[in-house]
């Protein structure tokens, strides 16, 4: 009885859906009038030779599943009604026979729990019969619901680890390249600074000794203080004008520079010679070349030999 009720519920739901899709009433579908009307229209379109039955259904906006449902429902309802009438008849006869037996035979009251829940049996393949492919779809949904969350978690964790590792490698490479580039830039700037710097071979100790000797000799002279006194005296205006005129005349005529404009050098200035050909090439003296190449990370074979010679000498093996 439970299976029959389940089938009736499914039938009512199907009737509602088909009635909504096609616009046909449920009474017309159950009585077979809808099927007769559809068959008449299909026959009219087919006899004209314009299209086939499938094309006619598509033209009317009705799918083959809906047409099959409309054609099956009247037969199913008629058979179900006959089966229900037969079941009622059998049930009535059974009830009569049961009453006669209870009257004739004294039976004890059963001790089974009268409040026990009854579950209607349903064929697992019933839904797949009416709706092909439903069981496979439900199985796929159950599978995804069971392990889909774990799969997404594992895939997300793997992707996150890959992103972190790749980002770490990229950052390490970028920092390493930036450090090397900045180091090379600094060393290149230092090398160019050394090339363009004014180099002087200083003789400061000798200058200090000469100054001390000059001080000692001046102290020994009796008239040094007097000469210094007259030398430090200021010039009167006529003498100052005459001195300025001589200085300007000598400087304008390309004469020698007065001693007051000559700066005492603390050493010997090293002169650098540029390349003869205008090729914008860098020129470095031989004595500075090992230093410049060392800043760029290259050591000439000659300098390597010098380093080996200046290093600790190995003891010669006696023969």
Curated annotation (Swiss-Prot):
The keyword Transmembrane applies. This is Minor capsid protein VP2. The keyword Membrane applies. Belongs to the polyomaviruses capsid protein VP2 family. A motif (Nuclear localization signal) lies at residues 311-319. One of its GO terms (molecular function) is structural molecule activity. Pfam families: Polyoma_coat2. A lipid is attached at residue 2 (N-myristoyl glycine).
